[in-house]
């Protein structure tokens, strides 16, 4: 049995949350996180989508495991990240690292767009 991830509860509590991260410009984030049976595609037992959206609703950043990515083989973990128009595999370690990586990427994109300094 794997040790319990102490940051998992924090991630699960974000399910359904929509947070405005730029009230003046309208950027917002959305969290969809649910427990699912562990499988080769979702070995951590989570179905998740963490996204940053622009004022027009366009997804700018996304970390999810909803579909396969071109560089992965069938039956491998589906974890990946979207950054603007680029999709790359993501090496899921634990919920805390997922949240830190997501918020770090959100900050980077908001800086590039001149939303934050």
Per-region residue spans from a language model:
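Well-ordered alpha/beta subsegment
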Residues: 85-115
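Short, charge- and proline-biased low-complexity linear segments
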Residues: 65-81, 109-117
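Short, surface-exposed secondary-structure junctions/capping segments
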Residues: 46-48, 74-93
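Alpha-helical membrane insertion/targeting regions
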Residues: 56-59, 107, 117
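Surface-exposed loop/turn and secondary-structure junction residues enriched for glycine/proline
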Residues: 32, 63-66, 81, 93-95, ...
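The feature represents the first ordered module of a protein
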Residues: 2-76
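Low-complexity, compositionally biased segments
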Residues: 18, 25, 67-68, 82, ...
């Amino acid at each position: 049995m794997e040790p319990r991830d102490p940051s998992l509860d924090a991630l699960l509590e974000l399910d359904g949350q929509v947070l405005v991260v730029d009230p003046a410009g309208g950027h917002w984030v959305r969290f969809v996180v649910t427990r699912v049976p562990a499988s080769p595609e979702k070995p951590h037992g989570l179905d998740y989508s963490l996204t940053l959206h622009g004022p027009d609703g366009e997804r700018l950043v996304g970390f999810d495991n909803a579909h396969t990515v071109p560089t992965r083989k069938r039956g491998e973990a589906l974890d990946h990240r979207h950054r603007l128009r680029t999709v790359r595999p993501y090496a899921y370690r634990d919920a805390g690292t997922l949240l830190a990586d997501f918020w770090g990427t959100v900050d980077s994109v908001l800086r590039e767009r001149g939303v934050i300094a």
